[in-house]
């Protein structure tokens, strides 16, 4: 079984999302001894944001692409291939300014491809082409967004839900770490998230 472990936080030491996702992956490896983990660290190897030339290449039939266009889509193709090759996905990320870090948004832009990860029907609807698989999303935020007055400010969770569903993935499991900006609340939030991992059916 193949696991794609996507890491987003640029904080390599002391990141709450990294700590909890690493714990989750360790738990998964205990349950699935043959688990093959592929780590995609977007903070260390950020994907370029899409430009006009690359988008044009996406919508050019593969057999009609120039060498330059083939080169332009190669990285995106690799991201899509990694997605298709995985049976499990663990995504760990902070919430920044109510939403996604731009490196994570870039990943979604690279893997959301007409004809590869979704298709249009004759009626104009869209159908995801990635077979449903289990996704664990470990999300850390400086303030509390899972309850209280700021719930509606959370733009991260709805985007992640819709973006994965867009390509056909609906089995999403969120593990939230609220209040990481304050050492006192962080010291409660991280163990709480780890306990929630222990309670999950994985």
From Swiss-Prot:
Cofactor: FMN
Name this polypeptide is given: FMN-dependent NADH:quinone oxidoreductase 2
Lineage: Bacteria, Pseudomonadati, Pseudomonadota, Gammaproteobacteria, Oceanospirillales
Family: Belongs to the azoreductase type 1 family.
Role summary: Quinone reductase that provides resistance to thiol-specific stress caused by electrophilic quinones.
Species for this entry: Hahella chejuensis (strain KCTC 2396)
Catalyzed chemical reaction(s): 2 a quinone + NADH + H(+) = 2 a 1,4-benzosemiquinone + NAD(+); N,N-dimethyl-1,4-phenylenediamine + anthranilate + 2 NAD(+) = 2-(4-dimethylaminophenyl)diazenylbenzoate + 2 NADH + 2 H(+)
Pfam families cross-referenced by the UniProt entry: Flavodoxin_2
GO terms, molecular function: electron transfer activity; FMN binding; oxidoreductase activity, acting on NAD(P)H as acceptor; oxidoreductase activity, acting on NAD(P)H, quinone or similar compound as acceptor
Textual note on the cofactor: Binds 1 FMN per subunit.
UniProt keyword annotations, A-Z: Flavoprotein, FMN, NAD, Oxidoreductase
Gene: azoR2
EC number(s) given by UniProt: 1.6.5.-, 1.7.1.17
């Amino acid at each position: 079984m193949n696991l794609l472990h996507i890491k987003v936080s640029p904080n390599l030491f002391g990141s709450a999302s990294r700590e909890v996702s690493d714990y989750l992956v360790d738990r998964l490896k205990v349950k699935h001894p043959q688990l093959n983990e592929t780590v995609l660290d977007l903070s260390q190897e950020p994907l370029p944001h899409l430009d006009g030339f690359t988008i044009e290449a996406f919508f050019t039939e593969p057999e009609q692409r120039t060498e330059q266009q083939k080169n332009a889509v190669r990285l995106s193709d690799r991201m899509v291939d990694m997605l298709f090759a995985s049976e499990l996905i663990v995504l760990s990320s902070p919430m920044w300014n109510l939403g996604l870090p731009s490196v994570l948004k870039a990943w979604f832009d690279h893997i959301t491809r007409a004809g590869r990860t979704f298709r249009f029907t004759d009626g104009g609807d869209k159908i995801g082409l990635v077979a449903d698989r289990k996704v664990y999303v470990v999300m850390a935020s400086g303030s509390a967004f899972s309850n209280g007055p700021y719930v509606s400010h959370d733009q991260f969770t709805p985007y992640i839900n819709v973006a994965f569903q867009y390509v056909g993935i609906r089995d999403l499991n969120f593990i939230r770490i609220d209040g990481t900006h304050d050492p006192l609340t962080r010291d409660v939030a991280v163990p709480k998230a780890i306990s929630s991992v222990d309670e999950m059916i994985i």
